[in-house]
Amino acid sequence: MVVEPKILNNICITAHPLGCAKEVENHINYVKSQPKVKSNVKNALILGASGGYGLASRIAIAYGLGAKTMSVSFEKGATARRTATPGWYNNEAFSAFAKKDGIEDKNLILDAFLNASKEEVIKEAKTFFNGEKIDLLIYSLAAPVRMDESTGTLYRSSLKPIGKKYNGIGVDFLTEELLEVSIDPANEDDIKSTVKVMGGEDWKLWTDALLNADLLAENAINVAYSYIGPEMTKAVYREGTIGKAKDHLEATAHELDKEMQEKIKGHAYVSVNKAVVTRSSAVIPTVPLYIGILFKVMKNKGLHEGCIEQMYRLLNEKLYNGGEVPVDSDNRIRLDDWELREDVQKEVLDSWNKLTKDNLKEIADLALFRKDYMNMHGFDEEGIDYSQDVQI
């Protein structure tokens, strides 16, 4: 069929297989163009590896470190009437490129929150890694719901402010119209549910399961991802329900770091990454507008990075730099260091404060935001004829 972007409420519900493959190839080519990262990492497990920072992690690990990668993701294949999810095509594309380049990989389509999935991954890992242990574990799940198997309760994450109603400005990144944004405050159930889905509980369950199965190598590194952001997004992000979940994730990192040091001389870290376009960030009120302004400022300063540049830098400058892993006072790796640089944030804030509907296009690079968003779904890629039928 001919596949075109179909967007409802700023959510793209179609994906183009050839375009997704092209985007994966672009990321692979970026890593190939960089120096190899010196490390002893041979085996990596990436939980949530089909898009965004998880996919970029996998590509950087496979092509930057030359490691075997096992991926866990919860994606859907195509049906007669609809395309597969972007992550499904990303997984397929990565495997095809890896095979061509002689890099071993395995994709598992599982709900990572389930105990049965953890058991399945442990069983598969023992075979796939040929009895060797995992040197690097990446936890990059971004799911809206999680089932608590012990109670049968289904928890849903929400993006809400805490304490008072949020009123602010946002943008429709497709039409480039400024919007007034209003979000009612969270109740206790909203907070609890969001922490349950997006906090550190499941990360700890995975780490403990792998340690108990004796699958984590001596000196193994374990990384989960977080975000802090600027003052202007704090009410709806870092000081809201999502922020409570990130606080829990970061507290869990301290616990896991201690446990891994004691058991395998390993380490667990949270890496605080920069704001990028993801399927999630595109629907967070205020965030697309902030990202559009940030992109403009960082591009002008030669500091702009997407997911793949960030993940290569994580490996090359932070985790495997030949010395100590640089962390802040809370033991977090800071890949948002360029985003939160004083000169960058000052320019972003100045632009934010003088924003009007008339100067929006000058101040915010929404064209780049839109391109990144479309690329994630396999659209707007160079060299692809979107008028042609494609096998979905």
Swiss-Prot record:
Family annotation (Pfam families): Eno-Rase_FAD_bd, Eno-Rase_NADH_b, Enoyl_reductase
Entry EC number(s): 1.3.1.44
Single GO term (MF): enoyl-[acyl-carrier-protein] reductase (NADH) activity
Entry-linked InterPro entries: Eno_Rdtase_FAD-bd_dom, Enoyl-CoA_Rdtase_cat_dom, FabV-like_NADH_b, Trans-2-enoyl-CoA_reductase
Pathway(s) this gene product operates in, as recorded in its UniProt entry: Lipid metabolism; fatty acid biosynthesis
Top-level lineage group: Bacteria
Role: Involved in the fatty acid synthesis (FAS II). Catalyzes the reduction of a carbon-carbon double bond in an enoyl moiety that is covalently linked to a coenzyme A (CoA).
Assembly behavior: Monomer.
Name the record gives this protein: Trans-2-enoyl-CoA reductase [NADH]
Organism of derivation: Brachyspira hyodysenteriae (strain ATCC 49526 / WA1)
